[in-house]
């Protein structure tokens, strides 16, 4: 809530300097959507809610929608700056938002880091999404560099394996492979 937001004019010198240097700006936007939702039976992220939660009762706290809108405005206002939004812009709950922004802004890229828990349960949709935006999705990780992490990543991206679990990722959804083309 406090501080400078992504669409604040005070951020413009950073964006413009990145553009002048041809340096992409890797940026985190918001948090996963469920962190902003009430703790009730409809909140899929509730299992992680004790550890990760946004307290929306704090005066001035920005909603998920507001943060995405501010980011979108910053990307729009700085077309010569390359933005790389981590974690599918934290919109993995509705990737049509990501698709709309990628379609609208040619200077926007996303990374896939730490979002298989939300996306590997919808493999057909993800295969289409990754295929459509193949040149705009970057690899990233927030999960360390263990052999198991890479094996899981490649299993999801490259195979058509169905309904498997990865216990150390702390999600209750199953995973399925996207069977992406080369």
What are these regions (language model features)?
Residues 66-73, 82-182:
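H/E-rich (His + Asp/Glu) clusters that bind or coordinate divalent metals
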Residues 1-97:
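Divalent metal-binding pocket/active-site signature
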């Amino acid at each position: 809530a406090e501080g400078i937001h992504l669409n604040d004019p005070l951020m413009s010198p950073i964006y413009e300097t990145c553009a002048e240097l041809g340096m992409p700006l890797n940026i985190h936007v918001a948090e996963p959507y469920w962190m902003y939702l009430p703790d009730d039976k409809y909140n899929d992220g509730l299992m992680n809610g004790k550890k990760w939660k946004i307290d929306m009762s704090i005066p001035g706290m920005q909603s998920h929608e507001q943060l995405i809108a501010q980011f979108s405005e910053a990307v729009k206002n700085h077309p010569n700056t390359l933005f790389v939004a981590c974690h599918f812009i934290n919109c993995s709950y509705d990737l049509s938002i990501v698709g709309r922004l990628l379609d609208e802004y040619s200077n926007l890229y996303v990374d896939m880091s730490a979002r298989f828990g939300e996306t590997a349960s919808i493999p057909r949709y993800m295969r289409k999404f990754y295929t459509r935006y193949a040149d705009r999705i970057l690899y990233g990780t927030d999960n360390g560099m263990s052999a198991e992490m890479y094996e899981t990543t490649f299993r999801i991206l490259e195979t058509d394996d169905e309904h498997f679990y990865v216990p150390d990722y702390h999600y209750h959804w199953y995973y399925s492979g996207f069977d992406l083309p080369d």
